[in-house]
């Protein structure tokens, strides 16, 4: 089956066509500045469309130019928030679309854009099977003691305030790949997976299932990220509010001006590492804060799974920054973690072990592929009609 994978943002639309049976990418692209003028960077230059419907026309033209008359079998959508209802990928109909739309308050930056993509496909190809694959779904297995916040119960019952977790599609895919690399059935796979990109999260895996994760009600909680603060004392927000900061000010500061950017003035890990190596004290401190926070989570999640059988790094920083992996590993001596410097520094796009034979647990680097995971889930759901 040929599957079109759509990742729809408020002003962008990333697409990829995959042959699921062959495991290959046939074409892909990115349309940007939707509703904002001209722009685009895909297989060819694309003029910025007025809206998502026009963007889809350009996607269709780009696909036809590359693939001719090959027919798509289904469309898979990345949907950021599935709330408590959606614990697995689902075939989209009007009721499902409305249900996703009702979750907009939980992900106001993402779900409305996801719905725009769904509606554009529905108008363009009304008979095309569409499947929603949710970032939150993999974390539906969190036990209540992991997803509950210690706040009055009415905040959960009336407002849905709880830990949801994100990056679930990536964490699930990487868990399966890592288990296979270690020749373990996924049902016996207990591990800690660190998805480290501009957005970053860490997940405790027990028996192949998520039992804890660092992102919470929103993707702001947890690790130090590119521009997001991660964990901090909530009273800081009360303090700043009394000092005149508006909710919009606080939201912008925490999501767009904090993290590596707040500490080092730059949200790009490569640049921060280079600056640190050149003697920049702020960059060095940013790396220390970021690696320390991650190491603390790794230690806690080692306990949460009853003793991890592996530590796995994935996503842009996790896959490519051997310097940052080394910084984190250096903080994990109490767990018996030992990384081989040569294996760690070697570049590869393949899943691999980078720890020494003496390491108490294997340390892995496993490239993620969320589009592949979405395509495979879409083919399975569309094929079964569920």
UniProtKB/Swiss-Prot annotation:
ATP binds at residues 14, 195-199, 268-270, 316-320. Substrate binds at residue 78. Its EC number is 2.7.2.1. It is found in: Cytoplasm. Mg(2+). Can also accept Mn(2+). CDD domains: ASKHA_NBD_AcK_PK (cd24010). InterPro entries: Ac/propionate_kinase (IPR004372), Aliphatic_acid_kin_short-chain (IPR000890), Aliphatic_acid_kinase_CS (IPR023865), ATPase_NBD (IPR043129). Keywords: ATP-binding, Cytoplasm, Kinase, Magnesium, Metal-binding, Nucleotide-binding, Transferase. This is Acetate kinase. The lineage of its organism: Bacteria, Bacillati, Actinomycetota, Actinomycetes, Micrococcales. The gene is ackA.
């Amino acid at each position: 089956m040929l599957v079109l994978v759509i990742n729809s943002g408020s002003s962008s639309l990333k697409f990829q066509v995959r042959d699921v049976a062959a495991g290959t990418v046939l074409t892909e692209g990115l349309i940007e500045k939707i509703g904002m003028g001209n722009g685009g960077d895909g297989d060819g230059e694309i003029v910025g469309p007025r809206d998502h419907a026009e963007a889809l026309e350009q996607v269709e033209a780009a696909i036809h130019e590359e693939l001719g008359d090959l027919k798509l079998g289904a469309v898979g959508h990345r949907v950021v928030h599935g709330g408590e209802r959606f614990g697995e990928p689902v075939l989209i109909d009007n009721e499902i679309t409305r249900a996703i739309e009702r979750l907009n308050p939980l992900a106001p930056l993402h779900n409305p854009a996801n719905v725009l993509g769904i509606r554009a496909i529905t108008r363009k190809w009304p008979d095309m099977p569409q499947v929603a694959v949710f970032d939150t779904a993999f974390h539906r297995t969190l036990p209540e003691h992991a997803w509950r916040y210690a706040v009055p119960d009415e905040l959960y019952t009336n407002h849905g305030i709880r830990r949801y977790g994100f990056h679930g599609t990536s964490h699930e895919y990487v868990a399966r790949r890592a288990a296979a690399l270690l020749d373990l059935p996924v049902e016996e796979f207990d591990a800690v997976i660190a998805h480290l990109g501009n957005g970053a999260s860490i997940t405790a895996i027990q028996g192949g299932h998520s039992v804890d994760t660092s992102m919470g009600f929103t993707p702001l909680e947890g690790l130090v990220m590119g521009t997001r603060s991660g964990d901090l004392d909530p009273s800081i927000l009360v303090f700043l509010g009394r000092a005149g900061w508006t909710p919009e000010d606080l939201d912008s500061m925490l999501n767009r001006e904090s993290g590596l950017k707040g500490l080092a003035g730059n949200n790009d890990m490569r640049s921060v590492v280079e600056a640190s190596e050149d003697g920049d004290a702020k960059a060095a401190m940013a790396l220390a804060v970021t690696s320390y926070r991650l190491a603390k989570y790794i230690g806690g999640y080692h306990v949460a799974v009853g003793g991890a059988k592996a530590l796995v790094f994935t996503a842009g920083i996790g896959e490519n920054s051997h310097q940052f992996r080394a910084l984190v590993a250096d903080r994990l001596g109490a767990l018996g973690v030992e990384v081989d410097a040569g294996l760690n520094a070697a570049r590869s796009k393949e899943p691999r072990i980078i720890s020494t034979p003496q390491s108490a647990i294997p340390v892995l680097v496993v490239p993620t592929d969320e589009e592949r995971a979405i395509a495979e889930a879409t083919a399975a759901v569309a094929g079964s009609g569920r």
